[in-house]
Amino acid sequence: MTRPLIAALILSGTALAQIKVGQIKGPLLDAHNCYPYHGQHTDRLDRALSLGFPVAIEQDVAFWKGQAVVSHTPKTTGVEPTLKAHFFERVRPLMEKALKENKKSQWPLIVVHFDFKDLQQPLLEDVWTLLGEYEPWITTARKTADPAKLSKFDVRPLLVLTEEADEQEAVFYNKVAVGQKLRLFGSAHTKDLTARATNYRRWVNYSWRAVEPEGQPKAGNWSEDDLARLHALVSKAHGLGYWIRFYTTDGFTAAENQGWDAGYNFGSHEAVLARWKAELEAGVDLIATDQYELLAKFMKPGK
C-alpha cells in the first residue's frame, strides 16, 4: 500500500469516525480488565477514572448466587465484587454530577464494555434489570421495527456496550418491544463481516491478531503490511457504520507486570508505542490496554 493511499485512509477513517461515531469521542483509552483479580489489583477502576474523561472501561461479568459479579472466569467463588457495587455505585457521584451540570456536549463520559464470561439467561436478565435501575444515566436508543434502521441515541453520561453472542441479543434486543429503549449495544460478528451496523449491533471488537497474525509476543518490528491491515479493518468498520475496538496492546517488562496477560505483551514501551501511534492515526475508536497511565500520557496533545 502506498503512503498517499495510507494517508487518504487515515483522513477518511477519521472523518467517518467523527460523522458516524459521534457518540464516542474517540479514539478513547479503553481500560482492559478493569477489576480485581482474586482480591488483588483492586485499584484498577480508580486508576482508570483518575485519568480524565471520556474513558472506556471493560468489566468482565459472571454469575454468583443470582447476582452479576465482575470476574475473569465463570468459576466464581463468592469473593468477587458485584457489578453493581464495583462499577455502578463507584461511578454514581460522577454520573449524578454530570446530570446536574448537564454538559451534554461532553457525553458520554464513560463507555463501559461488558465481556460476559457466562451466557446463561438468568445472568443476562439480571444485568438487563440492573441497567434499568440506572437508566437515567444510560445512553439509550428506541427499538425500531426494522433492525437496519438505526434510531438516534438519547445521549447520557454512560454508554453501555456488550459483545457479539447471539444469546445476548436474544435478551438485550429480541425481548425488547418495538418503540422501547435499548439499554446496551452489541458488537457484530467479525468473521466475513459484510453487514452494516444494525440498531443493536453498533461496534466491532477485533483481536490484535487481525492486524499482526503472529500475536503480540512474537511480533517483529511494526511494518507497512501491518499498517495496511490496520487501516483496511478500520476503514471497513467505519464504512459499515461501526465503532471499532482492538484488544489488547501492551508493552511491559517483568518488573512492570501488574497481573497482566503475557499474550498481549509486545515486551517494551517502544514496541507498543509504535502500535498506539498507528491506532490513533487510523482512528481506532477504542484502544484497549492494561497500561492505562502510559497510554493516557501518550495520547496527550503534543506527544
Model-identified regions with their sequence ranges:
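Phosphate-group recognition and catalysis centered on beta-loop-alpha active-site segments
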Residues: 18-303
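Sec-dependent signal peptide recognition
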Residues: 2-8
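Boundary at the C-terminal end of the N-terminal hydrophobic targeting segment
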Residues: 7, 15-19
